[in-house]
Amino acid sequence: MGGWIDIGHEGFSGYMALPESGSGPGLLLLADAFGVDGVVRETADLYAEEGYVVLAPDLFWRMERRVSLDRTEPDRARSAGFLRRLDLHRVLQDIAVALARLRTSFECSGKLGVLGFGLGGRLAFLTAARADVDAAVGYDPAGVQDALDEAGAVSCPIALHIGETDEAIAGAAREAILASFTGRADVAVYTYPGCGHGFADRLRPGFDKAAALMAHSRSLSVFKQAIGPQYDLSALWEEHTRLEFGARDAEATMQTMVAEPYVNHIPTMTGGVGYQNLLRFYRDFFIPRTPADTRLIPISRTIGTDRIVDEMLFCFTHDIEIDWMLPGVAPTRRRVEIPLVAIVRFRGDKLYNEHIYWDQASVLVQIGLLDPRLLPVAGVATARKLLDESLPSNGLIRRWAEGG
């Protein structure tokens, strides 16, 4: 998706990644102390999928060109050496050159943001204070606490992501950062419990996937609100479900998704990871194995920065074997109505993943395979109460009727 380009004179270069559309808002990606390595290039490609024109400049080029280090002890020592020799003034000059290159590129069709990790997190803060950018995000921004005299110069929205146990930005430093932005509605400082420095770096021992995903969504929120791009996620999801349940076209359904999507029906762990796997699932096990009389009744829809949470009633007659919901269970011809929740995540204007939840016990009760007299479970009543809140609550709590 991306490749190296020349940024300025004398060999200053950077890795540029473009969105599928070929153009979009600009995003300057500032690397950690390991250079423009595989993780940085993957991050650039990821944000390109989100719709950005991404440029990751080689900030160590004056010492050694196109540095790409791993996390081994020898490379960590080399990284520390680069940091000791780094000329912050000249690096910020190089960032200004990179911003100008990005701003004037014909692919960049909108405003500019800056995103940084580690060393790059601090540089993102300084860039927001000293340059003309429209949004900034910094991960693990060690050293920001020593530059808070510039906080007042930051006029754009900014978010900082800090691990709770990051010793480089410990309690007092974190409190100083928070105090510097008191009263700023466009500034967010997020702390991630139990996480250390580099929690979003998949190559570090302290990588925390859940925290990294949360931080990514928060970062997207900053950028999308400030610089775009904006997509009609509801319309994209409606088209996906139309192709899935209406047209029943597996190939067309896949065209609404990213190149390597995944779907997980949580109660039965059915779905697929990757294009070929998921295409096979849709074509052979989902679309032809969903009852013809299936109805999706919308209850509520919450639309976020990069995802939709859809609450619905899923209604059908169990007249075929439903591989994805009731694998191996012969048709009972019973009617089923269940509350179902779909959490759908997007990358740019494509679906990236789906997490689908429902109460499998309620399904089993309604088709006669589970006796509600023996377990604290309910059948179609769960669907009925979703539509009518006046129906009785707490019927499964035996002591509820005793008083109160």
Regions found by a protein language model. Name each.
Residues 1-253, 261-262, 267:
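N-terminal cap/leader regions of alpha/beta-hydrolase-fold enzymes
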Residues 164, 200, 204-404:
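C-terminal and inter-domain tail/linker signature
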